[in-house]
Amino acid sequence: MAILRADELRGMSMEELKEKLVELKRELLKERASKAVAGAPSNPGRMREIRRTIARILTIMNEKKRMTSQ
């Protein structure tokens, strides 16, 4: 899965963001499992990018929640 930028994420609906969040969390879990088994991941920067994208999604979801509550 390609890493999504903030402007791409802001164009998505809340449901799409939730789906991407679940998908990325699964991918991160797989990466962590492969790291635990194999020792060194095949792409060490991938875990960092997944974590950062998850943080972006959560930030944008919170922004959208705040905008609807105002």
Swiss-Prot record:
Q: Does the keyword Ribonucleoprotein apply?
A: yes
Q: Spell out the molecular function terms from Gene Ontology.
A: structural constituent of ribosome
Cellular-component GO terms for this entry = cytosolic large ribosomal subunit
Name the PROSITE patterns on file. Answer: RIBOSOMAL_L29 (PS00579)
Would you say which domain of life the source belongs to? Archaea
Q: Per the similarity annotation, which family is this?
A: Belongs to the universal ribosomal protein uL29 family.
Protein's UniProt name:
Large ribosomal subunit protein uL29
What gene codes for this chain? rpl29
